[in-house]
Amino acid sequence: MEDEEKAVEILGNTEAAHPPSPIRCCWLRLRCLAATSIICGCSCLGVMALVFAIKAEERHKAGRSEEAVRWGARARKLILASFAVWLAVLILGPLLLWLLSYAIAQAE
């Protein structure tokens, strides 16, 4: 009985000494998404997202997880903005051309 109590105490101490670090982002996936946003999205926002993703990965490797999460969040926002801008251009471009042709046809 004493052995079991000691084992439980030792396990409790090791868990308290090394709390599991929360994994909030896959850093490699974030970098790949940033590179994809350069190619498939608005490239200027994608480049900034890639820079922020690399900074987040470096901070994570250095053990500064709070800064890594902050830089990762910025990178994610820029990745989403890059894709949103590109989708808006893809949708609004043809729509505006259609409206322009309609307006010209009505003017004649």
From Swiss-Prot:
The gene is TMEM265. One of its GO terms (cellular component) is membrane. InterPro entries: CD225/Dispanin_fam. Its main location: membrane. The keyword Transmembrane helix applies. The chain crosses the membrane at residues 34-54, 78-98. This is Transmembrane protein 265. It comes from the Eukaryota.
